[in-house]
Amino acid sequence: MFKGIFIKNFFNLIINQGINILIALLATRILFSTLGEAQYGLVNLALSVVLLSSITVSYGYHLNGPKRIALFRDESAKKETLINEIIATRIIIAFGMAIILFCLTYFFGFFKSYAALLYYSLILLFSQALFPMFYFQGNDKIAWASLVNAFAKGAYLLLIVLFIKIPEDATYVNFLFGITALIVYIVTWIIIYKKE
């Protein structure tokens, strides 16, 4: 049984990473040709700053979260309390990191050349806070993670095609990335809570 779950999860993770690579390649081609070299570089710079900051948002929870979820698999009240604690803590940390980045930019002049782009990118911290991978890993439901990821990335790619038309739209690229993930993750958590 364990071997079957391991193989299934392994292939689902491969599919998940394949989707990530495919969407990244398509988005890169579209964004680079639409935004130009300079704006595309700033988009990725802002994305890098926020993603590095988001490490603190998920710090430790991607390791101990699945283990603790697995321990409470058959105890729905304890599992729900644990999920609430993890999500609440991650959201509080996301707010803290957003405030720190805002203050560094607004008051101290860090990231000044792409401040607006960075502000719009802060939503990625909150989408990271709601990322349900720890839940799927703890319940051996990696296929769900692949499905959620595919939906979020597909919606992001569609929004890029629809709304990113000129170099000045660079400000909104990371916002679209964050908002699609955030909405998909909120809907996913609603479904999870209804099923639990």
Predicted feature locations:
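Helix-loop junctions and terminal segments of transmembrane helices
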Residues: 57-74
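Membrane-interface helix-capping segments at transmembrane helix termini in multi-pass transporters
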Residues: 35-46, 72-84, 95-126, 166-173
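Membrane-interface junctions at transmembrane-helix termini in multi-pass inner-membrane proteins
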Residues: 3, 115, 125-148
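Alpha-helical transmembrane segments of multi-pass membrane transport and lipid-handling proteins
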Residues: 18, 22-25, 57, 63, ...
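Hydrophobic alpha-helical transmembrane segments
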Residues: 119-122, 146-163, 167-195
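Signature of the first transmembrane helix
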Residues: 4-62, 98, 157
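Residue-level recognition of pore/gate-forming positions within transmembrane alpha-helices
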Residues: 17, 21, 48-51, 94, ...
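Structural signal for membrane-spanning alpha-helices in multi-pass inner-membrane proteins
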Residues: 24, 28-32, 55, 101-105, ...
